[in-house]
């Protein structure tokens, strides 16, 4: 479990970087399942994903000398490299280019996430850069946990369940840590 203080600190570092996305009532799903269903609109982030939260929170915690060497991830205003599979949708690539504002070099390699990740880790090691794991790092999870903080700040009446996608587990770990801590 991630300490709530780390999630709160990550939320502070994300001000002006990530937007606080709305929690939107979904009438169709609510009627279908006979309950109130809200969707957290992380697709409205400039890179169309919650992953910005974790990567940026991690970079904010890095010492300046490590940032100067660069990072291997999708970064904001620091020299960095982003490794993605060749199968990555063009829309995602274009959003990262736009958001990276010339600071991010995109390297398409491998057919799968695992292949791209292995290439990124090898590159980071070879060039003495910091590899920012997309989900398996405490600071990344804290950044992703800010989604849970925002959900709970909406002050909805009686939340019974929170569902989150599970890829690597960083989002659900961060959201779950925050909600469990305050409940």
Language model features with spans:
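PLP-dependent amino-acid enzyme catalytic core
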Residues: 1-183
């Amino acid at each position: 479990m991630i300490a709530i203080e780390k999630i709160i600190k990550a939320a502070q570092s994300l001000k002006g970087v990530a937007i606080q996305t709305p929690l939107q009532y979904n009438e169709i799903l609510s009627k279908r399942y006979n309950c109130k269903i809200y969707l957290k609109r992380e697709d409205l982030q400039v890179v169309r994903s919650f992953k910005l939260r974790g990567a940026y929170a991690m970079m904010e915690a890095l010492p300046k000398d490590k940032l100067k060497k660069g990072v291997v991830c999708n970064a904001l205003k620091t020299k960095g490299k982003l490794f993605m599979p060749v199968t990555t949708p063009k829309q995602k690539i274009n959003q990262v280019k736009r958001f990276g504002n010339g600071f991010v070099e995109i390297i398409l390699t491998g057919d799968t996430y695992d292949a791209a990740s292995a290439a990124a880790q090898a590159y980071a090691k070879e060039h003495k850069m910091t590899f920012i794991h997309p989900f398996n790092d405490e600071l990344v999870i804290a950044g992703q946990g800010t989604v849970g903080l925002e959900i709970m700040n909406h002050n909805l009446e009686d939340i019974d369940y929170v569902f989150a996608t599970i890829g690597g587990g960083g989002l659900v770990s961060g959201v779950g840590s925050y909600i469990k801590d305050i409940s």
